[in-house]
Amino acid sequence: MREPLLQLIVLSLIIIVVNTQFESGRLCFCKGFEAVEPCDCSKPQTIDKLNNHRIYEKVQKLLKKDFFRFYKVNMDKTCPFWADDRQCGTNQCGIAFCDDEVPAGLRRRNAVNMEAAAVKEEEDDDAEKCADAGNNIDPMDRTLHDDEKRQLDAMDHHDDGLEDKFCEIEDDESDGMHYVDLSKNPERYTGYAGKSPQRVWKSIYEENCFKPDPKFDKNFLTNPSNFGMCLEKRVFYRLISGLHSAITISIAAYNYKPPPPSLGQFGSQMGTWFRNTEMFAGRFGTKWSWEGPQRLRNVYFIYLLELRALLKAAPYLQNELFYTGNDVEDAETRKAVEDLLEEIRAYPNHFDESEMFTGVESHARALREEFRSHFVNISRIMDCVECDKCRLWGKVQTHGMGTALKILFSDLPHSHYKQDSSKFQLTRNEVVALLQSFGRYSSSILEVDNFREDMYPGESVMNTAADGPPRKSNKIDL
């Protein structure tokens, strides 16, 4: 009798604590004893102020550079877990996918010597075919200019240090690998909904071998919780929840309202992009679930984890040339990287990876390997996403998170690496994915502040920032 009563008391306390997380005075987040805790926005060390005042503008400036804009990816890999015909549930979430539209300089090496006239003819034909297909709301842009092709041919390089991978690694020279300009394909609403994304997220949460109840059911997917887990299991859960939540924030921040049906298919009015505060409040508030604010905390947790990975990789990044063939821009990129690292170094409250995978060596190694292998599977699940743009960003973000985990955990004492193995190697694609992933979480935290101002006027941390990014209106012009 005492045990159920104790559990009820603990649950009640949890609900009370969580319900205070969105009350005035506790709207921001700070580094806590283990991870992230709600705190007063007036505190100087809030993660919100770090990001919105000091980090956000610098990382966005960096991601506009050629070295970081282009990501090499195979968008045609088969889903390894179930049959997938890549047909979206609506005609709004599909996008045009035309391999031959990719410029000759970025195709596989045996196609580079094709005659320019033939290539141009193929590209024109494919572009015409693509014009009538795919996502009507936000199609994926695969175009590259000639000077961009030449730079990318020179800037792509890779290494052999892939033994400790935390995500599915694609061979840069394999068939199907093509460059995508991420600046032309921002993460936002695409209309992708229904059974397909539900199946993907169900599989991702099922891949979480650390869930409290070994028998997975829909209640865990609806209201997942890390209550009762050890540190490593809580970290794994937070990675999944934080990824899910960051994607939801992007969709809510860049949501789409279609034109009135009365206009018909010949109507000239376009739909409206807007910030969907109601969607944000429903997902991250406490109206429907006490778990809402916890989901936000997991976004901040991944932000701190990737911030720590960037700090740990700082010596490597400082020696990187970030070569694109444009000497002026390459120098600007190196300066932008150093400016970002300087801000990261100044922050005192970083994630501490040394607390993980400790104890008996054999158990720690087994737990670390289980952690690694299950995260690899999550990265593979991204090939099962039917919406191309959603799949692209799913692959980028899991690749970036996997790179962060590789940096943080590959040189721990119980790793299969030697104790003094501090000179890890990264591919160009890993560096791009890590910064792009960090950029997504940085943007999410800024958007949280925009939503915070909508829901609690005057509580935004940006109200006190004279040099921060301008606040967005509820209606978004793209």
From Swiss-Prot:
Its cofactor is FAD. The keyword Signal applies. Residues 1-20 form the signal peptide. Disulfide bonds join 28-41, 30-39, 79-384, 88-93, 209-230, 387-390. The keyword Signal applies. Its EC number is 1.8.4.-. It is a peripheral membrane protein. Its main location: endoplasmic reticulum. SUPFAM superfamilies: ERO1-like. Pfam families: ERO1 (PF04137). Glycans are attached at residue 377. Keywords: Disulfide bond, Electron transport, Endoplasmic reticulum, FAD, Flavoprotein, Glycoprotein, Membrane, Oxidoreductase, Redox-active center, Signal, Transport. InterPro entries: Ero1, ERO1-like_sf. Residues 117-143, 459-478 are annotated as: Disordered. One of its GO terms (biological process) is response to endoplasmic reticulum stress. It is found in: Endoplasmic reticulum membrane. Oxidoreductase involved in disulfide bond formation in the endoplasmic reticulum. Efficiently reoxidizes pdi-1, the enzyme catalyzing protein disulfide formation, in order to allow pdi-1 to sustain additional rounds of disulfide formation. Following pdi reoxidation, passes its electrons to molecular oxygen via FAD, leading to the production of reactive oxygen species (ROS) in the cell. May function both as a monomer and a homodimer. Belongs to the EROs family. This is Endoplasmic reticulum oxidoreductin-1. It comes from Caenorhabditis elegans.
